[in-house]
Amino acid sequence: MNNVFVMDHPLIQHKISLLRDKNTQTKEFRELVSEISMLMGYEVTRNMPLKEVEIETPVGVARTKVISGKKMGIVPILRAGLGMVDGMLKLLPMAKVGHIGLYRDPETLQPVEYYCKLPCDIAEREIVVLDPMLATGGSASAAIKYLKERGVTSIKLMCLIASLDGIKKINDEHPDVLIYCAAVDDKLNEHGYIIPGLGDAGDRLFGTK
């Protein structure tokens, strides 16, 4: 698998197991998604550029490093991607947040756009697209294409569980985009859901069916 980083940290793997459990209730599910997103955020931001600066401490001067380079942006794919935002903002409180609303047509399994609101300086930012489940890959690919059409040149995709089909679609259509996930499952069912997966992430986050 090209450009795919599967995070095997014990805390992430433990929390993913709890997410998969059908008995995990909405409140705990929501908390787990936020916690996993924050843990994954450490790896997604690992290669952020740094520059040396001098900082005056209470007792002297220290040469240390601060983040430089492009500012960050976070773009959740509505609605399930919203559950990942808070965890990322705990790491990146100054990041701007855009929203892309897509739903999957139940007949064709193709993405349908219904909402988009992005920061005016989106093209100047390094963007992390948030989508808990990379199933067919259609919605994520459409969101990435939408961002590129608006001048974004640096995009990463962060998801909790990815399918092999979804990974292939992103690799084929956006070979420049790095994919970060916590688990890879083999199959999709006839409705486009990842098997074994964790069910409908949006429904489990928001208590809907």
Swiss-Prot record:
Assigned EC number: 2.4.2.9
Primary role: Catalyzes the conversion of uracil and 5-phospho-alpha-D-ribose 1-diphosphate (PRPP) to UMP and diphosphate.
Reaction it catalyzes: UMP + diphosphate = 5-phospho-alpha-D-ribose 1-diphosphate + uracil
Gene3D superfamilies: 3.40.50.2020
Keywords: Allosteric enzyme, Glycosyltransferase, GTP-binding, Magnesium, Nucleotide-binding, Transferase
Family label: Belongs to the UPRTase family.
Cofactor-binding details, from the entry: Binds 1 Mg(2+) ion per subunit. The magnesium is bound as Mg-PRPP.
InterPro entries named in the record: PRibTrfase_dom, PRTase-like, Upp_B, UPRTase/APRTase, Ura_phspho_trans
The name this protein goes by in its record: Uracil phosphoribosyltransferase
GO molecular function: GTP binding; magnesium ion binding; uracil phosphoribosyltransferase activity
Pathway(s): Pyrimidine metabolism; UMP biosynthesis via salvage pathway; UMP from uracil: step 1/1
CDD domains, sorted: PRTases_typeI
Species name: Acetivibrio thermocellus (strain ATCC 27405 / DSM 1237 / JCM 9322 / NBRC 103400 / NCIMB 10682 / NRRL B-4536 / VPI 7372) (Clostridium thermocellum)
Binding site for uracil: I194, G199, D200, A201
Cofactor: Mg(2+)
Activity regulation annotation text: Allosterically activated by GTP.
Superkingdom to which the source organism belongs: Bacteria
Keyword Nucleotide-binding carried by entry: yes
Binding of 5-phospho-alpha-D-ribose 1-diphosphate, residues: R79, R104, D131, P132, M133, L134, A135, T136, G137, G138, S139, D200
BP-aspect Gene Ontology terms: UMP salvage; uracil salvage
